[in-house]
């Protein structure tokens, strides 16, 4: 394992974390929108 390999792995891990974070944020927003629609219907 060279330093370049470790650096590449670090970048990939960061990208995966960002993708996971954006997925979580998007799903949270969708849940909030669904709740708003339900409360508006009542």
From Swiss-Prot:
Its main location: cytoplasm. GO terms for biological process: cell cycle switching, mitotic to meiotic cell cycle; mating type determination; negative regulation of conjugation with zygote; positive regulation of meiotic cell cycle; positive regulation of transcription by RNA polymerase II; regulation of cell cycle switching, mitotic to meiotic cell cycle. Keywords: Cytoplasm, Nucleus. Signal peptide: none annotated. It is found in: Cytoplasm; Nucleus. GO terms for cellular component: chromatin; cytoplasm; nucleus; Pi Mi complex. Coiled coil: none annotated. Mating type proteins are sequence specific DNA-binding proteins that act as master switches in yeast differentiation by controlling gene expression in a cell type-specific fashion. Required for meiosis, but plays no role in conjugation. This is Mating-type M-specific polypeptide Mi. The lineage of its organism: Eukaryota, Fungi, Dikarya, Ascomycota, Taphrinomycotina.
């Amino acid at each position: 394992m060279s330093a370049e390999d470790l650096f590449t792995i670090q970048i990939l891990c960061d990208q995966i974390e960002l993708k996971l974070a954006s997925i979580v944020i998007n799903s949270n927003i969708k849940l909030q929108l669904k709740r708003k629609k339900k409360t508006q219907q009542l």
